[in-house]
């Protein structure tokens, strides 16, 4: 049987081969998700699978992914994994891993794992995966730790497997240090399996096409993607465009500032002027910051090209050492998403005057809200699981924001039924909040109200990570702000980044923020206002007072 065409200069051949690589990453994604033990990996999809070339550059990424992983895995491979373990120090069956936040994704629960792929005795590529483990020891995932040493166990780049044999001492140390050893070990095994799938399928792909390595294909993919990104940048006017965003922070407000500097076919983002690092777990490390800088700009420049190294090269960023977006190595950062998730909105705001038709309003899912529920079951065994609560997406030039969406995280929510199996709670309410979306020509997505009741006989400790309680999500292009968030226990306000203890029968109620609007509310069509009224997404009062609507209003909307 003749070999398939391998002309990398032929766009059709290149696209077919490229899609095959993405499918390989998707196969591994499916394996990891289907075999993972913990809800945060299995249900929330808080993981990624990536194929890297022999230099550690991103070649193909699974279709469904967390944006932070766009740059994290290839940067970790190129800057840390490969220098410590070059190809001549690796053998088939080796698996490398670390959870060092300076190397991976900025916080300890994320484990970065890389497996060399051999063909004819030579390393031709690497399979990479990152997954958010359900526990890593230390303080439960929230915002109160004052340094990284309180947040859990940290292990450097190690050989988790050597020539296919597990390093049992390392596994023993990890399992002895966490609250959920079975789930943690199971998730690590799932990552190993996913990487093995990528390795096996890539070798089959190379054999099918008669290739010895991926070098030529990688060069074609990277150069095409980089050229496409640079072409899109050249369509924007040169200049420096600035913005700032005010956040709740932990106990004092945090200011994020950015200057987006466009010069010919490259973009540089400078975060000078951003608030200093803090003695709480909301510091955002360089790798996490850069990932969101790239993601935001890719959304505006070239959202269709699949993620790979070429998309990254034209974009750089920087932040002063010691600020909350470039903290010292010892600082805490387990809840770094409370800061990092806002970076895309900050960049959109800076570019509002450059590409108003492409930016969207600030999102209530930025950052994602999380409740880490920990305690003892009635039989004395321990449980622990994280539930996410999403706010409304910001509105866009052509569409309303989506309700309760986790932009920019792209995380799913653990199904209520699965969460109630993992944790002794009853979800009494889960509903959209009318009028929570920021008004505009296009309305911001709605936030939600969720009520959880402790059904267990023992107290439940809930560690909260939330934002936008004092500073709601802003609109763009004259759009209005969405509603702010709330956290309550039995009707009494709670500290949104603290620990809430629920005794038997007590309730936690959260109201997530609504997304910001796009365009002036006076420009919203009557048809859309009437549709919102009919679906109880806005009230009659809002229709009259905010949108200036004077048409008929059904009784249900009064």
Where are these regions (language model features)?
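Active-site Gly/Thr loop motif
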Residues: 96
């Amino acid at each position: 049987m003749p070999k398939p065409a391998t002309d990398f200069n032929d766009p059709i051949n290149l696209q077919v081969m490229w899609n095959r690589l993405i499918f390989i990453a998707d196969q591994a994604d499916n394996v990891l998700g289907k075999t993972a033990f913990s809800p945060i990996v299995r249900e929330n999809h808080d993981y990624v699978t990536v194929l890297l070339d022999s230099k550690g550059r991103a070649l193909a990424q699974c279709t469904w992914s967390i944006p932070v992983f766009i740059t994290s895995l290839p940067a970790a491979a190129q800057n840390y994994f490969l220098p410590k373990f070059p190809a001549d120090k690796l053998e088939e069956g080796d698996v490398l891993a670390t959870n060092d936040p300076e190397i991976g994704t900025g916080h300890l629960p994320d484990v970065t794992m890389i497996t060399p792929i051999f063909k004819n005795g030579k390393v031709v590529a690497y399979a990479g995966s990152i997954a958010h483990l359900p526990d890593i020891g230390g303080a439960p995932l929230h915002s109160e730790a004052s340094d990284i040493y309180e947040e859990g166990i940290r292990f450097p780049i190690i050989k988790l497997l050597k020539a296919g044999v597990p390093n049992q001492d390392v596994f023993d140390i990890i399992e002895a240090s966490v609250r959920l050893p079975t789930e943690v070990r199971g998730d690590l095994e799932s990552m190993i399996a996913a990487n093995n799938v990528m390795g096996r399928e890539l070798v089959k792909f190379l054999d099918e096409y008669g290739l010895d390595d991926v070098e030529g294909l990688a060069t074609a993919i990277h150069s095409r993607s980089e050229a496409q990104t640079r072409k899109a940048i050249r369509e924007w006017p040169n200049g420096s465009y600035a913005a700032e965003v005010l956040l709740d922070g932990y106990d004092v407000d945090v200011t994020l500032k950015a200057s987006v500097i466009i010069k010919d076919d490259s973009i540089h983002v400078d975060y000078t002027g951003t608030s200093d690092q803090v003695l709480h777990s909301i510091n955002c490390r360089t790798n996490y910051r850069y990932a969101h800088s790239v993601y935001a700009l890719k959304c505006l420049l070239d959202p269709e090209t699949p993620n790979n190294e070429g998309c990254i090269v034209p974009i750089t960023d920087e932040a002063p050492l010691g600020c909350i977006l470039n903290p010292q190595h010892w600082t805490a950062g387990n809840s770094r998403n409370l800061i990092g998730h806002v970076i895309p909105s900050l960049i959109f705001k800076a570019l509002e005057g450059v590409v108003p038709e492409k930016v969207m309003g600030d999102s209530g899912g930025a950052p994602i809200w999380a409740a880490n529920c920990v305690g003892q079951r009635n039989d004395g065994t321990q449980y622990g699981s994280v539930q996410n609560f999403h706010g409304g997406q910001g509105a866009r030039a052509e569409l309303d924001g989506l309700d309760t969406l986790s932009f920019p995280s792209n995380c799913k929510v653990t199904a209520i039924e699965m969460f109630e199996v993992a944790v002794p709670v009853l979800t009494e309410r889960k509903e959209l909040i009318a009028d929570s979306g920021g008004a505009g020509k296009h309305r911001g997505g709605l936030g939600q109200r969720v009520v959880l009741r402790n059904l267990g006989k023992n107290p439940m400790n809930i560690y909260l990570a939330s934002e936008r309680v004092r500073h709601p999500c802003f609109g763009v292009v004259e759009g209005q702000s969405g509603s702010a968030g709330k956290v309550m226990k039995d009707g009494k306000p709670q500290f949104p980044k603290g620990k809430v203890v629920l005794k038997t029968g007590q309730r936690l109620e959260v109201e997530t923020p609504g997304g910001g609007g796009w365009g002036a509310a006076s420009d919203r069509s009557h048809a859309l206002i009437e549709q919102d009224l009919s679906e109880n997404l806005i009230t009659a009062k809002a229709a009259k007072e905010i949108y200036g609507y004077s048409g008929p209003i059904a009784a249900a909307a009064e």
